[in-house]
Amino acid sequence: MAKDGPRIIVKMESTAGTGFYYTTTKNRRNTQAKMELRKYDPVAKKHVVFKEKKV
């Protein structure tokens, strides 16, 4: 069974449509809104915006 705490695992999916994603954790008490980060997508070979999706 999963650990019930303030930190949850989230999937950051590329908006370039390549299907590439990162997994990271976030504190659900401090960061309640969906995260958006600009990270490198090796499939697209450039920096793109990654949006939070459910795992």
From Swiss-Prot:
An MF annotation (GO) of this entry: structural constituent of ribosome
Keywords: Ribonucleoprotein, Ribosomal protein
KW Amino-acid biosynthesis (keyword) present: no
GO terms of biological process kind: translation
Top-level taxonomic group: Bacteria
Pfam families on file: Ribosomal_L33
Keyword Ribonucleoprotein attached: yes
One CC-aspect GO term: cytosolic large ribosomal subunit
HAMAP family in the record: Ribosomal_bL33
Family, similarity comment: Belongs to the bacterial ribosomal protein bL33 family.
Identification of the protein by name: Large ribosomal subunit protein bL33
Organism: Deinococcus deserti (strain DSM 17065 / CIP 109153 / LMG 22923 / VCD115)
Lineage of the organism: Bacteria, Thermotogati, Deinococcota, Deinococci, Deinococcales
